Amino acid sequence: MRAVIQRVSEASVTVDHKVCAVMRDGLLILLGIENEDNEEDIDWLCRKIINMRIFNDEDEVMNESLKSVDGDAIIVSQFTLHASTKKGNRPSYIKAAKPEVAEPLYLKFISKFQNELGKDVGSGIFGGDMKVSLLNDGPVTIIIDSKEKR
């Protein structure tokens, strides 16, 4: 399971000209799910993201976490995070989980994230053609892969 997390001042997700999530001051999380991903990956990645100290304290040092600053979040499914570009010019998505596997894991990730954070978060529409708007803060952008925890 791979996540690209971006610290943002604001973000929103729109599907079919309807806004389905809006937030201020927190994280926009792009989530890619692989064939082998499971609930252990969900647990580890949720804890890692929520507790990662990437928000500034009063001295402008990154010592605060999403949880400690009571920040918001939007989680967006993005299978293209598992693109392979080794051969040719057309990316291969063979490592990305099929929708019937990925969607339940995506929904479990959102549920676990909300439970760990202690508040509701926004999300995109799984498989939807989404328009994601954001205003980076920093910028701070970090890639986290649950396969690298071992």
UniProtKB/Swiss-Prot annotation:
One of its GO terms (molecular function) is Gly-tRNA(Ala) deacylase activity. GO terms for biological process: D-amino acid catabolic process. The keyword DNA-binding does not apply. It is an enzyme of class 3 (hydrolase). Keywords: Cytoplasm, Hydrolase, RNA-binding, tRNA-binding. It catalyses: glycyl-tRNA(Ala) + H2O = tRNA(Ala) + glycine + H(+); a D-aminoacyl-tRNA + H2O = a tRNA + a D-alpha-amino acid + H(+). Pfam families: Tyr_Deacylase. InterPro entries: Daa-tRNA_deacyls_DTD, DTD-like_sf. A motif (Gly-cisPro motif, important for rejection of L-amino acids) lies at residues 138-139. The keyword Isomerase does not apply. Its EC number is 3.1.1.96. It is found in: Cytoplasm. Its main location: cytoplasm. GO terms for cellular component: cytoplasm. Belongs to the DTD family. Homodimer. An aminoacyl-tRNA editing enzyme that deacylates mischarged D-aminoacyl-tRNAs. Also deacylates mischarged glycyl-tRNA(Ala), protecting cells against glycine mischarging by AlaRS. Acts via tRNA-based rather than protein-based catalysis; rejects L-amino acids rather than detecting D-amino acids in the active site. By recycling D-aminoacyl-tRNA to D-amino acids and free tRNA molecules, this enzyme counteracts the toxicity associated with the formation of D-aminoacyl-tRNA entities in vivo and helps enforce protein L-homochirality. A Gly-cisPro motif from one monomer fits into the active site of the other monomer to allow specific chiral rejection of L-amino acids. This is D-aminoacyl-tRNA deacylase.
